[in-house]
Amino acid sequence: MQIRRSEKWVWQNRTAEREENDLGLQDDRMSGNIQDIARLITRLLLKGDMPQYTLPAAEADYTEADQLFKKVIGLADEGDINGAENELLMNMKEDDPDYLELALTFYLHLNDMDVDYLDDHDYSREEILDGLKSLAEDWGVTGLEALV
C-alpha cells in the first residue's frame, strides 16, 4: 500500500510539473505573439522593424513624450503597472508617431517582465496584448484578433 501512495505522489508531482511546463510554454507563446504584433504595427505605421523609443542623454533635452516615457517606465518598474498604463493612455497624442513608438516600447517593456512580477502587480500578458490591439485600432489597424 505504501508503494501505491508513493507512486501516486510521484504521478501527482509529474502532473504538476507538466502543468507548470505547459503554462511556461503558453507564456512563451503569448510573449512571442506580443512581439510579433508590436513588430507588425511598427512595420505598418512607423516603417521600422521594432519600436525602440530612447531618451536623450540630457534630461534638459526631454520633450513631453520623453517625460511621459520616463514616468510610465518608472511607474511600471515600481510595480504600478496599471497606473503606468493609465498615465500613458491619458497623455497619448493622436497622430504623433513618437507617441505611438513610445507606447509600443512601453508594452514591449512590460512583455520583458517576468510573469510572476506581472501577476504580483495584477497585470498579465493578455492585458499587454489587449493594449497593443487597442493601440493598433486607434491608429487604424484592425483585424489583429485573427492573428492571435
Q: Which residues make up each language-model segment?
A:
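Inward-facing hydrophobic residues that define packing positions of alpha-helical scaffold repeats
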Residues: I34, I41, I81, E87-L88
